[in-house]
A protein has these predicted regions:
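Conserved PLP-enzyme active-site core in the AAT-like
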Residues: 1-168, 190, 194
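Structural motif of enzymes handling amino- and sulfur-group chemistry
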Residues: 146-215
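Conserved C-terminal alpha-helix-loop-beta "cap" of PLP-dependent enzymes
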Residues: 190-274
Length: 277
């Protein structure tokens, strides 16, 4: 029958990987929570393996994961395509499309991070892979009368135009000025929260990807009487609601400038300060 298993490193399981199962595919882990070796991938390939999926976040390197280079080598030696989720890998510009240039058969990029609408993205890959994707799109569903899975996932023409405009803008703007502005706005939050007792704030040292700089917020609950989750809940319940989160296995809230209009970072910082004073 049809191959239906997509291999994914156990270390790389993440919130969005279940989207791969929308077509009826089955995710199969390889490796362990501690590390992934070449042999782990080699021994996991079967007659049912349809692809190997790789989650790429260059700003968070993982020395214990099997590298993309080795993944591509092993998969291609066995005639298996490699899919890369590179949603936020848009800066520096030389990583834009980098993974298909390395030999991956497909990579996706989220266009929202460049200013396009939330529902849009880019699919890069081999001619064969893009042809297959086009058959599953709502255009393929209607135009070619192929009963794929893309009918519910319409992208309007104006959204497509928006993606083109966003990419052109992203490729030509002054990124040094963009980063300097984000760093300065992150600093405003630090200035507001820096004098609050029991609070530790620091600049996130990163310029790669879609969320440069930003602020890492930690609290001493014994001093503030407020936990990180309390902050999340109270910010969400306020007016206007501010959505933050504490990711699993982390002891801080990361506050990013992406998505905030000029001046809104001061609202965020002031609201948090009010909760902690």
């Amino acid at each position: 029958g049809m191959k239906n298993e997509i291999l994914i490193q156990k270390r790389q399981r993440y919130w969005y990987d279940r989207c791969l199962e929308a077509s009826g595919a089955k995710l199969v882990d390889f490796g362990s929570d501690e590390e992934t070796t070449r042999e782990d991938l080699i021994n996991s390939i079967t007659v049912n393996t349809a692809a190997v999926h790789f989650y790429m976040v260059e700003q968070e390197p993982d020395s214990k994961a099997l590298s993309l280079e080795e993944t591509i080598e092993i998969a291609h030696d066995n005639g298996i395509p490699v899919l890369v989720d590179a949603a936020g890998q848009i800066y520096p510009l030389d990583i834009f499309g980098k993974y298909v240039r390395m030999g991956a058969d497909f990579q996706c990029i989220a266009a929202k991070y460049m200013g396009a609408s939330q529902s849009t993205g880019l699919a890069l890959g081999t001619e064969e892979m893009i042809r297959k994707i086009s058959k599953q799109s709502f255009v393929g569903y209607e135009g070619r009368r192929i009963r794929g899975i893309g009918r519910p996932h319409k992208v309007d023409r104006q959204e497509m135009v928006g993606v083109v405009a966003a990419v052109r803008h992203w490729m030509t703007i002054n990124h040094e000025e963009r980063l300097a502005s984000i760093e300065e706005r992150s600093g405003r939050i630090i200035d507001i929260l820096g004098g609050v007792e029991g609070v530790e704030v620091s600049m996130i040292d990163n310029i790669m990807g879609h969320q440069p700089f930003g602020v890492q917020l930690q609290v001493d609950e014994k001093i503030t009487g407020v936990s990180l989750q309390d902050i999340v809940d109270k910010l969400k319940a306020g007016d206007p609601p501010i959505w933050t989160r504490v990711r699993e296995n982390e002891n801080f809230i990361a506050i990013h400038i992406f998505g905030l209009k000029e001046g809104q970072e001061e609202i965020v910082g002031s609201r948090i300060a009010e909760l902690l004073r």
